[in-house]
Curated annotation (Swiss-Prot):
Known catalytic reactions: (Z)-3-aminoacrylate + H2O + H(+) = 3-oxopropanoate + NH4(+)
GO cellular component terms listed in the entry, alphabetical order: cytosol
Native organism taxonomy: Bacteria, Pseudomonadati, Pseudomonadota, Gammaproteobacteria, Moraxellales
InterPro entries membership: RutC, RutC-like_sf, YjgF/YER057c/UK114
Record protein name field: 3-aminoacrylate deaminase RutC
Top EC class of this enzyme: hydrolase
Annotated source species: Acinetobacter baylyi (strain ATCC 33305 / BD413 / ADP1)
PANTHER family membership: 2-IMINOBUTANOATE/2-IMINOPROPANOATE DEAMINASE RIDA, PROTEIN HMF1-RELATED
Amino acid sequence: MPKEIILPEGTPPPLAPYVPATKADNIVYVSGILPLDENNDVVHVGDAAAQTRHVLETIKHILSNAGGSLKDVTFNHIFLRDWADYPAINQVYAEYFPEERPARYCVQVGLVKPDALIEIASVAHV
Protein backbone atom coordinates (compact mmCIF):
# COMPACT_ATOMS: atom_id res chain seq x y z
CA MET A 1 0.00 0.00 0.00
CA PRO A 2 1.62 3.27 -1.07
CA LYS A 3 1.48 6.16 1.35
CA GLU A 4 1.75 9.88 0.80
CA ILE A 5 3.59 12.14 3.21
CA ILE A 6 1.66 15.35 3.99
CA LEU A 7 4.02 18.29 4.67
CA PRO A 8 1.95 21.49 4.41
CA GLU A 9 3.68 24.86 4.35
CA GLY A 10 3.09 26.94 7.43
CA THR A 11 3.11 24.06 9.90
CA PRO A 12 5.90 23.89 12.48
CA PRO A 13 8.69 21.41 11.82
CA PRO A 14 8.26 18.14 13.75
CA LEU A 15 9.94 17.93 17.15
CA ALA A 16 11.10 14.35 16.48
CA PRO A 17 11.44 11.94 13.52
CA TYR A 18 7.84 12.03 12.24
CA VAL A 19 5.73 13.95 9.72
CA PRO A 20 2.59 16.05 10.27
CA ALA A 21 0.43 13.47 8.46
CA THR A 22 0.41 10.49 6.15
CA LYS A 23 -2.28 9.41 3.71
CA ALA A 24 -2.89 5.80 2.70
CA ASP A 25 -5.98 4.27 1.07
CA ASN A 26 -7.82 7.61 1.39
CA ILE A 27 -7.24 7.69 5.14
CA VAL A 28 -5.28 10.58 6.60
CA TYR A 29 -3.45 10.02 9.87
CA VAL A 30 -2.60 13.34 11.50
CA SER A 31 0.19 13.24 14.08
CA GLY A 32 -0.34 14.77 17.50
CA ILE A 33 -0.62 18.51 16.95
CA LEU A 34 0.49 20.89 19.68
CA PRO A 35 -0.30 24.64 19.86
CA LEU A 36 3.00 25.71 18.30
CA ASP A 37 4.09 28.52 16.00
CA GLU A 38 6.51 28.11 13.09
CA ASN A 39 9.44 28.25 15.56
CA ASN A 40 7.97 25.46 17.72
CA ASP A 41 7.14 27.90 20.51
CA VAL A 42 3.86 27.42 22.38
CA VAL A 43 1.22 30.02 21.50
CA HIS A 44 -1.54 31.39 23.75
CA VAL A 45 0.20 30.32 26.96
CA GLY A 46 -2.33 29.67 29.72
CA ASP A 47 -5.39 29.85 27.42
CA ALA A 48 -6.81 26.38 26.75
CA ALA A 49 -9.56 27.66 24.45
CA ALA A 50 -7.14 29.61 22.23
CA GLN A 51 -4.69 26.70 22.16
CA THR A 52 -7.50 24.33 21.15
CA ARG A 53 -8.55 26.69 18.36
CA HIS A 54 -4.94 26.92 17.13
CA VAL A 55 -4.55 23.12 17.13
CA LEU A 56 -7.83 22.57 15.27
CA GLU A 57 -6.92 25.25 12.70
CA THR A 58 -3.61 23.47 12.14
CA ILE A 59 -5.39 20.12 11.68
CA LYS A 60 -7.83 21.80 9.28
CA HIS A 61 -4.87 23.14 7.26
CA ILE A 62 -3.18 19.72 7.17
CA LEU A 63 -6.39 17.99 6.06
CA SER A 64 -6.95 20.60 3.36
CA ASN A 65 -3.48 19.80 1.98
CA ALA A 66 -4.46 16.13 1.95
CA GLY A 67 -7.68 16.81 0.01
CA GLY A 68 -10.02 16.73 2.99
CA SER A 69 -11.65 18.80 5.70
CA LEU A 70 -12.70 18.55 9.32
CA LYS A 71 -15.98 17.01 8.11
CA ASP A 72 -13.92 13.96 7.07
CA VAL A 73 -12.53 13.34 10.57
CA THR A 74 -13.66 10.00 11.98
CA PHE A 75 -11.61 9.91 15.20
CA ASN A 76 -9.76 12.35 17.44
CA HIS A 77 -7.28 11.51 20.17
CA ILE A 78 -7.23 14.38 22.67
CA PHE A 79 -4.51 14.79 25.25
CA LEU A 80 -4.89 17.52 27.86
CA ARG A 81 -2.63 18.63 30.68
CA ASP A 82 -5.35 19.51 33.22
CA TRP A 83 -8.97 18.37 33.54
CA ALA A 84 -9.85 21.91 34.65
CA ASP A 85 -9.44 22.90 30.97
CA TYR A 86 -11.93 20.26 29.77
CA PRO A 87 -14.97 22.62 29.57
CA ALA A 88 -13.07 25.29 27.58
CA ILE A 89 -11.64 22.66 25.24
CA ASN A 90 -15.08 21.14 24.65
CA GLN A 91 -16.65 24.52 23.92
CA VAL A 92 -14.15 25.24 21.13
CA TYR A 93 -14.24 21.63 19.93
CA ALA A 94 -18.04 21.84 19.51
CA GLU A 95 -17.61 24.90 17.25
CA TYR A 96 -15.38 22.91 14.90
CA PHE A 97 -17.49 19.75 15.01
CA PRO A 98 -21.09 21.03 15.28
CA GLU A 99 -22.74 18.04 13.58
CA GLU A 100 -21.83 14.45 12.84
CA ARG A 101 -19.11 14.57 15.44
CA PRO A 102 -16.27 12.08 15.18
CA ALA A 103 -15.54 9.46 17.80
CA ARG A 104 -12.86 10.51 20.27
CA TYR A 105 -11.18 9.91 23.54
CA CYS A 106 -9.63 12.39 25.93
CA VAL A 107 -6.95 11.65 28.51
CA GLN A 108 -4.92 13.73 30.92
CA VAL A 109 -1.17 13.49 30.29
CA GLY A 110 2.10 15.34 30.58
CA LEU A 111 2.88 17.01 27.26
CA VAL A 112 6.28 17.42 25.59
CA LYS A 113 6.10 21.24 25.79
CA PRO A 114 5.52 22.48 29.38
CA ASP A 115 3.25 25.40 28.34
CA ALA A 116 1.11 23.28 26.00
CA LEU A 117 -2.32 22.52 27.44
CA ILE A 118 -3.63 20.31 24.62
CA GLU A 119 -2.54 17.99 21.83
CA ILE A 120 -4.84 16.39 19.25
CA ALA A 121 -4.17 13.58 16.77
CA SER A 122 -6.79 12.85 14.12
CA VAL A 123 -7.87 10.22 11.63
CA ALA A 124 -9.88 11.28 8.57
CA HIS A 125 -11.36 9.40 5.60
CA VAL A 126 -11.06 11.60 2.50
